[in-house]
Amino acid sequence: MHEKRRERGRTYRVGLILGFCLLIAVNGLFPVSCVYAEEEQTKIAYGENTPGQLYARSAVLMDADSGRILFAKNAETERPMASTTKIMTCILALERADPDESVSVSANAAAQPRVRLGTVEGQKFKLKDLLYSLMLESHNDTAVMLAEHLAGSVEQFADEMNQKARELGLSHTHFVTPNGLDGADDGGSHRTTAEELARIMRYCVMESPKRKEFLEITGVSSYQFSDLEQTQTYSCINHNAFLTMMEGAISGKTGFTGEAGYCYVGALKREKRTFIVALLACGWPCLLYTSPSPRDT
């Protein structure tokens, strides 16, 4: 009896994380033709109810209420994490700045690669509006604008991101960029692990004094704003498809770079508990880039 109950529990947990992966493949969160990984394909079988294959190279399912890891695959392997980085950028901005502050666009920010808001040097925006741009549309120029506003430079902001990671007890996470573009510095490459990415998300949605604001931003379907000069209006659509496709989904962030592949971190409420899933290296496009691409989503 007890063994059957444990088996059902294991199958449920793996089924939950596989549900995320299936939605990624089928419902357009990532392109269907690319959701496979070339190595480390692990067959997971628990009794008669075999959930199938989990193709993400690294994956974690966490009970966010307790911090307990319910399922793990290569959870401590360091990998680049693409735009899932932006959950750290967002929570630091919420904790360290007034949402009504004015943020100016530098030449460096305006020159960032797609995906971008499309700003020009000298424009000014309300910080709160930029957080929606950051989290809904994953704009790379917005991330740099916030980093420069909060810390004076991208490099200094990366130092502050790493300091926050250390405060959270994360020893395998290193930030180089605020937007998740592939990069490296004296501390090594831009990287995390599936477990530590899940722990960052747990902090954002469960522990941060600004968790309510974080959930509000990441939970809306769309948002519209203008620059402070009212010269242009911008519309943002939330690309976290799980908000409408999976019951109980409350927050999440997608990502992709040439080195990271497709990545995702998200939170959902199920049976009065909060769960977090982190997926790294879910796959790459079948038609690989002929040269390194800076694109991040």
Where do the language-model regions lie?
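A short, sequence-level motif marking secondary-structure junctions
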Residues: 15-19, 77, 132, 240-241, ...
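Domain-terminus/edge residues, biased toward the C-terminal soluble/receptor-binding domains
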Residues: 170-171, 185-295
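Structured C-terminal helix/loop/strand segments within mature extracytoplasmic catalytic/sensor domains
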Residues: 10-13, 28-58, 64-71, 75-79, ...
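Bacterial N-terminal signal peptides that target proteins for export
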Residues: 6-18
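Viral structural modules
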Residues: 2-3
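Active-site-adjacent loops and short helices of periplasmic peptidoglycan-processing enzymes
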Residues: 35-199, 204-209
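Hydrophobic core
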Residues: 20-28
